[in-house]
Amino acid sequence: MGNRSTIEFDLLGNATDSIERAIDLVAWAGEQDDARRLKQAVQTIAHGVELLLKERLRRVHPALIWEVVDKYPSLSARTVTSDGALSRLISIGGLTFSQKDMDLVRSLRSTRNAIEHYAWTTTKQEAERIVGRALAFALHFAEAELGYEFFGYHTRKDDTFSSLLKANTVFAKEMASRNEQGSSTDGLEEQLCPFCRAVAMNANTGACRLCGHWSYQSKELYVDTPF
């Protein structure tokens, strides 16, 4: 009788696996096609962030992961979305999130839905900004709320983190900001989206709730090259 092998991921393991994949896609780009690499990075980091939120919610109470708590623990029933997990962590778990982070989580979910269920048009710079901001949030949340470090004595000790900082300047700036002063911001009104021209762009994330684009706001002139 042959050896039987079990493949198993708990919530945290599932989340960190996806985030590690996003990290590798950014830090070790190599000769990979940028369009495919960044699309996969957005998908995996969005998946990982949602599962990190659910894992934190599970630690409040496992039943809270289910959309209808009475359905716990049926795997055929729907679990909460990232929005739902965020709301329950605030109202039941007692956690606080900056407006900037709440906007990020919601915009990230919308972008992932566009990729997986419809169509997605973006630029390399926009995609890198999405991934950079999401990775910074994920690493901060995992350590602060779940006691998990992606880079440390018990995890990765190679030069991946240095490579990640060099590969994505948005990530580097976000990490520096979180380390220095946190990430609290006041809510801002929606602004004009430069892509669809609707007043529907979130001032914190730069994500448009109508067309899905994430606009990079800067005083410096840049050329945003499409894939």
Residue positions per predicted region:
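Charged alpha-helical initiation segments
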Residues: M1-V42, Y153-Q191, G206, H213
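Charge-enriched, short contiguous segments at helix-coil
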Residues: G13, R36, G94-Y153
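Short, surface-exposed loop/turn segments at secondary-structure junctions
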Residues: E31-K39, A63-E67, K124-Q125
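Short, hydrophobic, well-ordered secondary-structure elements
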Residues: L38-R59
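Flexible secondary-structure boundary motifs
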Residues: L53, L57-V105
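Long amphipathic alpha-helical segments
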Residues: R58-I65, Q125, A144-R178, D224-T225
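Short Cys/His-rich zinc-binding micro-motifs
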Residues: E190-N202
